[in-house]
Amino acid sequence: MAVACSPEKDQSLLQLQKVDSSRVILSPVLSSPMETNQPICIPSPYTDRGHDFPTIPFYSATNFSYANPPAISDRPSVHQTLSPSLFWPSHGHVGTTLPLHHLQARPQHGQAVQSPWVELSPLDNVLTSSKSARRRSQENEEGEVSSGGKADLHFCAVCHDYASGYHYGVWSCEGCKAFFKRSIQRHNDYICPATNQCTIDKNRRKSCQACRLHKCYNVGMTKCGMRKERGNFRDPQMRRVTRLSSQGRTSGPSVLNGPAVGPLNTPQPPALTSKQLIERIMEAEPPEIYLMKDMRRPLTEANIMMSLTNLADKELVHMITWAKKIPGFLELGLLDQVHLLECCWLEVLMIGLMWRSVDHPGKLIFSPDLSLSREEGSCVQGFLEIFDMLIAATSRVRELKLQREEYVCLKAMILLNSNMCLSSSEGSEELQSRSKLLRLLDAVTDALVWAIAKTGLTFRQQYTRLAHLLMLLSHIRHVSNKGMDHLHGMKMKNMVPLYDLLLEMLDAHIMHSSRLPRRSPQQETVEQCDAPARPHSPGTSGPTNTWTPSCTGGRGEPQ
């Protein structure tokens, strides 16, 4: 017997028709009596709107050997299969599983079965409905995520554009990801044309490469910051992690119980080893500076001072670039960066002068095309004492056989230790910047110890050499103070025009120092005692306060 189904919109009965008969009988599915020895065929070609259900096979009692199989040789429409198809009408589909099961697990009991179809038990209904509800809730959740659009989108931590993924440890867009990749692969030396405070956003991210790279490091981008969680974003666990991460960024820091998940941790730049730090500092070394003009003979005081100030101004430009390349220097506060350079610029120039002159006894190599002997330097008034101090310090460097790794570490320590006692503010930003400065200074000190240990000396010899190298810094500071006094005196006498950058650095060094000028008793008044005097710069109106700060007494001496 075959069943032909004619699905109508409002009909809940199936039409049962014999193969060899033209009568159509309407009978309910559950209440109609059926023959137990014949298969049921419901080959209705039904397809629901928007739902495509697979064919569900059902088997009659004939397949389980507890009834005699009927003779079906005269029924060509059934063919050789006993596995008919069942399709449900469209108005009866409510998104749940079929409410009818076949007695497939009970043939061994030998019970007399009147019909191959039975209703589900209440427990089966509960289990089926719970599975269906769970499936619907999961589909609804995925639908909300897909239809929510930008609800779960992330923004680039650098330029605040839409992020394309988790790159180098942070959420970033394709542009910032590619820019950071190029920067770390090619070692580009970017220089900010302004004050390293350029605004980096979606529209102005290409205006300053130096500030853009600085912001990449500030937000946590690192070469080793690979994404640990690379699962599908549609996974429920991944959605919960990213949703919690976005809430943490908007609502501030919170204490989480249990282990932290990868994307929730703010990735920190990996700490450099002592060897890597020295390599980075050596790569930051400025190139050789040439005077690019012939010295007139015989040498005069004005001629020598003009050449020396010209070289100093050129070296100051490269010194700023060198300081920016030192790992961790740009992480300091901007005021600290400026103060460090203003307080140590002459010391940095002098240790570089000693390093260039170490192989030329009795001479000072200011540049490859400018070298002065003691006799030539004596023509500058007050310069001979400074010249002798520089020659003596250079001889000490030669005796210690200073290595290049040790030299770059000492030079970096001069920069980082220059204004250690001048900062008096106690704000949170100042304290944080100071702690970064101390950590950076400790890292450079460890690198110096590593460079000394690499020479193969014993522990006692290493400690002794470290002490001797550190004592060089005090000699350089002493010579620098002498040189600052001499340069300031030349400026007051208008002996030589000073360039803008050199003049600014000279005035800033005097201003940041704690040494105050001592006025003569005839000029002292109550108002003058309350207000400290400031050195007069050329080109400004007002009385000229001519004084030369002493390097040892802590007070200025009148001229």
From Swiss-Prot:
Disordered, as annotated region: 128-148, 243-269, 514-559
Stretches the record annotates as Modulating: 1-155
UniProt cross-references to SUPFAM superfamilies, sorted A to Z: Glucocorticoid receptor-like (DNA-binding domain), Nuclear receptor ligand-binding domain
SMART domains per the UniProt record, alphabetical: HOLI, ZnF_C4
Boundaries of every NR LBD domain copy: 273-509
Broad class of where this protein is predominantly found: nucleus
DNA-binding residues (ranges): 156-221
GO biological process: cellular response to estradiol stimulus; estrogen receptor signaling pathway
A single GO cellular-component term on record: nucleus
Localization, UniProt: Nucleus
Biased composition (Polar residues): 243-254, 538-551
Any one GO MF annotation of this record: steroid binding
One Pfam assignment: ERbeta_N
The entry's keywords: DNA-binding, Lipid-binding, Metal-binding, Nucleus, Receptor, Steroid-binding, Transcription, Transcription regulation, Zinc, Zinc-finger
Zinc finger (NR C4-type): 156-176, 192-216
Described function: Binds estrogens with an affinity similar to that of ER-alpha, and activates expression of reporter genes containing estrogen response elements (ERE) in an estrogen-dependent manner.
Domain notes per entry: Composed of three domains: a modulating N-terminal domain, a DNA-binding domain and a C-terminal ligand-binding domain.
UniProt family annotation: Belongs to the nuclear hormone receptor family. NR3 subfamily.
Quaternary data: Binds DNA as a homodimer. Can form a heterodimer with ER-alpha.
Protein name per its UniProtKB record: Estrogen receptor beta
